A protein has these predicted regions:
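Glycine-rich acetyl-CoA-binding "A-motif" of GNAT/NAT acetyltransferases
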Residues: 78-81, 187
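Conserved N-terminal entry element of GNAT/NAT acetyltransferase domains
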Residues: 1-18, 22, 26
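Conserved acetyl-CoA-binding loop-helix of GNAT-fold acetyltransferases
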Residues: 148-151, 157-170
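Conserved active-site alpha-helix within GNAT-family acetyltransferase domains
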Residues: 174-175, 185-203, 208
Length: 221
């Protein structure tokens, strides 16, 4: 998608991808799913800085993999970023396919013990980690999936989020497309409902205190 006010990051724009990964990764230290995932490193004494480094690398993998298919974006003033794609632009690939073929930035910085702990934690969280469901719900029809977004911490309260999401929703409305995302907190659910999203379903696992709220925004919501 080419969206006004947003930079569609190319795979060779490494500085912009790193900037987007920093914005989202640093914000995701507060995001419930990510916080639970990296809590697996607490037994190694991992501090916030180490967890942020890992989240940045994880996001850099995901953004770089999706940038090949117009799936990574920055506001032109670089105060907010999002990962998301128009399903038809994946050219038959899936979100899972792209994540499985990421460049390996995360793997390069992990110790063997960290890698094992995070892999085991992700497997344990599988029931509340369903991130490739929208294409099934849409019966392979076109739609927009937003897999991550965030505002730079230093730019919060300045309207960056609204300036980022308005072009996405305008495109969705113009082309009669559903938009999808997931969230894991009441606060985020309320914010997304303010933008016109509604709950599709909620996934839970008794082993974890968080729930996955899968949400849709219908055209002209």
């Amino acid at each position: 998608m080419n969206l006004p006010g947003l930079i569609t990051i190319r795979p060779d724009q490494h500085d912009l991808l790193a900037k987007a990964a920093q914005i989202i990764g640093d914000s995701f230290i507060e995001e419930p799913w990510s916080a639970v995932w990296v809590s697996a490193l607490d037994k190694f004494g991992a501090d916030t800085a180490r967890k942020q480094e890992i989240l940045r690398a994880s996001l850099l993998d995901e953004l770089t993999a999706h940038a090949r298919y117009q799936g990574a974006y920055l506001l032109e003033d670089e105060t907010a970023a999002f990962g998301g794609y128009l399903y038809s632009e994946l050219e038959g690939r899936t979100h899972t396919d792209l994540d499985a073929n990421a460049p390996g930035f995360l793997d390069a910085i992990l110790t063997p013990d960290e890698r094992k702990a995070l892999t085991e934690q992700a497997a344990a969280m599988e029931r509340i980690s369903q991130f490739d469901w929208t294409r099934v719900r849409e019966n392979e029809g076109d739609h927009i999936y937003l897999y991550s977004w965030a505002v730079d911490k230093n730019a919060r309260g300045k309207g960056s989020l609204r300036r980022m999401v308005e072009p996405i929703f305008a495109y969705a409305d113009e082309h009669n497309l559903n938009c999808y995302l997931e969230c894991y907190s009441d606060h985020l659910q309320s914010m997304y409902e303010h933008f016109g999203f509604e709950i599709v379903d909620v996934l839970s696992d008794p082993a974890f205190d968080i729930t996955e709220r899968r949400m849709v925004r219908r055209p002209n919501a």
